[in-house]
Amino acid sequence: SETTYSLFQKGRAHLKRGMAAQATVSLEKAKARDPEKASIREALGIAYFRIARWEAAEAEFRKVLELSPVDDYAHYALGRCLEKQGRAREANGQYKLANAMRPGKADYESRIKDFS
């Protein structure tokens, strides 16, 4: 039987090869065994994002932030999920948080909009 770590590694390998749907299978199994592991939840969020399952991706990134509130990438990724769901103002708040945590990262800065 596969270890949680080997399931996680298999999921990441699928992601690297552009096989996001397959990645979700291994990563969901890993998550079932270790639901509090932020790295598993982040990889799963990325996989769901890549197959346009925005709500599922959002849920994973929210869990990552529950486990690790200062994870700048998770704030950015959550923003991307919200933006894909048409929630631009909410997304903007996440981009601002990500940018505040890691100033000068072009990906984060470029997504911030001025809604004033």
Predicted regions and their residues:
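Alpha-helical segment of the N-proximal tetratricopeptide repeat
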Residues: 2-33
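TPR/TPR-like (Sel1-like) alpha-helical repeat modules
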Residues: 80-107, 113
